[in-house]
Amino acid sequence: MKIRIAKEDLVKALKKVIGGIGVGGKDLDYLKITADSTGVEFMTTGRLLGIKTKVSERLEVKEPGECCTNCRRALEIASLMPEGEITIRQKDSALFMEAERCRLKGEVGDLENVLPFQALEGEEKRLSLNAYTFKQMITDVLFACYRGEENPQMSSVYFEIADSTVQVTALDGHQIAIRKEEVKPTGIHANCMIRGAILSAILPLIPSDIEKEVTFVIGENRFLLETETDKVSGALTGGRFYEYERLFPDKSPVVKIRVDKAILMDTIGRCAYALMPAMSGNVPQPTIFDIDRTINVHMDGKVTVDEELAADVEGKPLRIGLSPAIMKGILKAYPEDEIEMHFYGKKNVVVYTGDTAKFVQLPVNIRD
């Protein structure tokens, strides 16, 4: 195998596929390179995730063939090469990257050790989605996933497709994030769970282009995601997602507020800065909200925050404690310029409502 490719395109391709290694376990670090008359394909496959990307422009395939090598090492070597075109060639058990006045050598691995790119099994539910919207929906809920691996359901994002509606949900026991969008009628009714770690690895592959589309396919145990140049095969999380709907109160809120998002984010940013490292028991430090005609925000920590915010307030006075760290993540993902919050009492959840998004935050106990 011998190819000539621009360094920029090579590094970009390797950064795309490196996410397919080590998600949810210790996978062997293998990169498979396949060159033929249609271009060059780079592929990594792990236990839970496989990624492949194809480069068809600004390259020359001088000798078709295929080989495998260490992906991380290949990316390191490519990054060290001078700008411009790079020749990649295999000779016996060595893989050379060459440019003017520079040649670096890596090792070739055994192709038999490369796991196959797994196809879907069972009935396939296939739909096309706007790339920008799909990426933004995942981004807006991903922060609410549980970070550990011991609870696969809670560390996953739940996808629900109901004909012309797509909804994604994530929760971690302290917060819930829900994002919903209307799409063209699909005739599809399906749901699945995908680990947050998998979504984090593939999120950079989804174009941030409102004019482009992605194909999302749900199978029995796996999903596929396809763009113009990339293809992802990932494992679905088994089991059932939590019945999160029952966490939403079925009564009217004690008080509703509407406040400017930018102003509230600035205040909560200062409260998050004030957080002290937990001394024992990981007891969260609350930001105290005194809600009456205005909102008084108080936080004691590295610094003391004491601010009064103008807001539209409807309901009874309320004093409640909220984690500023959790609130900061919710405010960042909230898609509108004005935030509407519903409070159901000092010991009940707080619901952030919007046209296409909904977030829930559990309060922190405070002294009266």
Regions found by a protein language model. Give the residues of each.
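Structural preference for solvent-exposed beta-strand-turn elements
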Residues: 1-368
